[in-house]
């Protein structure tokens, strides 16, 4: 646990297995079947409850068919909490407060009142591909009422913690009954996810 450069050096030079707690580039994916009110409440909590923790959502992925019904109220709520919102070009006309996102934003753990939003045009498979490419393997959530989409997401996102209709900030050892956590392992090898004394 620590800064990226420290962790990468330890991993590179270590002669033994290292349990690493890397960046928390967490995603919340809003599927077109999701309930707008739930999406607003969960998404705002996932970012703004504590913006500086590793379980905070850094990128919202939203189905193109959910933009009109879901996104305006989410943007309004985030604006009220002084969150800077960076979006792809197609969304800029939704609100004058929005800023243009760069490709670097998809790789960024802000740890601040900043969030990026990307439109998903080809459904859950595209969302999973984005997460597995840009994410850090920490925590990712899907907001959906579609069982097939949920099952696909939970089975294919390659992260230590995957969630359904839940804030990514729920990712904590205490919440899972592990007691106080040492960190959240983003390793492929076990232990993976929240690591408490028992897992160590």
Predicted segments, located by residue:
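Active-site phosphate-binding strand-loop segment of PLP-dependent enzymes
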Residues: 1-2
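Conserved C-terminal structural/oligomerization subdomain of aldehyde/semialdehyde dehydrogenase
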Residues: 102-200
């Amino acid at each position: 646990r620590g800064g990226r450069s420290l962790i990468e050096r330890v991993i590179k030079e270590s002669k033994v297995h290292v349990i690493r707690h890397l960046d928390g580039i967490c995603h919340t994916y809003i599927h077109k079947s999701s309930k707008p009110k739930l999406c607003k409440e969960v998404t705002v909590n996932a970012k703004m409850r504590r913006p500086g923790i590793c379980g905070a959502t850094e990128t919202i992925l939203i189905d193109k068919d959910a933009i009109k019904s879901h996104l305006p109220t989410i943007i309004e709520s985030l604006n009220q909490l002084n969150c800077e919102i960076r979006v792809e070009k197609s969304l800029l006309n939704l609100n004058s407060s929005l800023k243009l996102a760069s490709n670097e934003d998809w790789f960024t753990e802000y740890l601040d009142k900043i969030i990026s939003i990307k439109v998903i045009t080809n459904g859950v498979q595209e969302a999973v591909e984005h997460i597995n490419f840009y994410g850090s393997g920490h925590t990712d959530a899907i907001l959906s009422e579609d069982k097939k989409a949920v099952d696909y997401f939970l089975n294919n996102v390659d992260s230590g913690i995957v969630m359904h209709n839940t804030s990514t900030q729920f990712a904590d050892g205490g919440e899972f009954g592990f007691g106080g956590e040492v960190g959240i392992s983003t390793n492929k090898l076990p232990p993976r996810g929240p690591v408490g004394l028992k897992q160590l």
